[in-house]
Amino acid sequence: MSTSTASNVHAFDRRLIARMTGALGDDKVIGRTALELAQVFDELLPGVLQSETGCDVTIAYAGFRTGLRNELIAALGDGVLLGDLSLRNWCADFQVGCDSPVLIALVEALLGAEPTSIEEPAPRSLSKIEIDVALPVFHGIAEVLRTAVNAPGGFEPVVGRPYNSAERAKPDPVLQDVFAASIDMTIGLGPVLSTFSVIVPQSTLLKTRVVSRKGAGEDRNAKTEWTEQLEEQVRRSAVALEARIRLESLTLDTLSRLQAGDVIPFHDGQDVRVEVSANGRDLYVCEFGRSGSRYTVRVKDTHGSEQDILRHIMS
């Protein structure tokens, strides 16, 4: 190839190729599909979540954004819970992101707090138990989405375990990012107003025909499988407990010379006091004891009410 010929070779514009192959659409077309999906969320999701939580959850369309998928996800910011989902015969890889404040408020409501009395929580990463509680919420969003799209076969969506945005792996620079759209919805519980986003490749949205099914989720009084799953998640969530016993005070000189096999007595001669904690929070005042061949602690007092302890464990 001559120098003059090489100088006339130009790389194809990536956006142009994406438009030619159906991977990028006009904002007007994408916006129309986003609005249709938002109308289904607005129509069905409040009823689904109200029947599960007993709370009046408000849903409203907050607009849409377009761009590269990884950039749209990064723009959600910190304090967001993310989930990777797929729906056979519709989209093999899409994401849902939800601001943490409304999920924290939902946990408070499930623990018995009046939604109207919940103060707006600050965005933060969620604990393992809070994520356990949030998982069925992601299932609810996915189920409403399933009712809205034309996915043949009636397959159920696959919802990966949600994770905090700070834990999301960095994109592989070798893999080319895809053009996507973020459908943004506000979700309100009491005075707490947050946003959840559904991020879908534009190639999928351009082929999507939205079908509204008004009958879905109309029975708000029925205790559904979603509720049972939520309760089971909470019941089966394991909590690591720690016990702390005060030992006899030692001088710095003695402490520095301790060797393997040396014994340090408990501070309390009788009724040895044990502080039991979880997630860095003191929960119970206990008494050290023994049952058969196992050492145990007996609860003697609590640090707060049952609701206080649950909130400490969940946070």
UniProtKB/Swiss-Prot annotation:
Keyword Membrane: yes
Secretion signal, residue range per the UniProt entry: none
Pfam families xrefs: FliMN_C
Keywords: Bacterial flagellum, Cell inner membrane, Cell membrane, Chemotaxis, Flagellar rotation, Membrane
Swiss-Prot/TrEMBL GO biological process terms: bacterial-type flagellum-dependent swarming motility; positive chemotaxis
Topological category with respect to the lipid bilayer: Peripheral membrane protein
InterPro entries listed in its UniProt record: CheC-like_sf, FliN-like_C, SpoA-like_sf
Localization in the cell: Cell inner membrane; Bacterial flagellum basal body
Principal location: membrane
GO cellular component terms given for this protein: bacterial-type flagellum basal body; plasma membrane
Function: FliM is one of three proteins (FliG, FliN, FliM) that forms the rotor-mounted switch complex (C ring), located at the base of the basal body. This complex interacts with the CheY and CheZ chemotaxis proteins, in addition to contacting components of the motor that determine the direction of flagellar rotation.
Family per record: Belongs to the FliM family.
PANTHER family: FLAGELLAR MOTOR SWITCH PROTEIN FLIM, YOP PROTEINS TRANSLOCATION PROTEIN Q
Name of the featured protein: Flagellar motor switch protein FliM
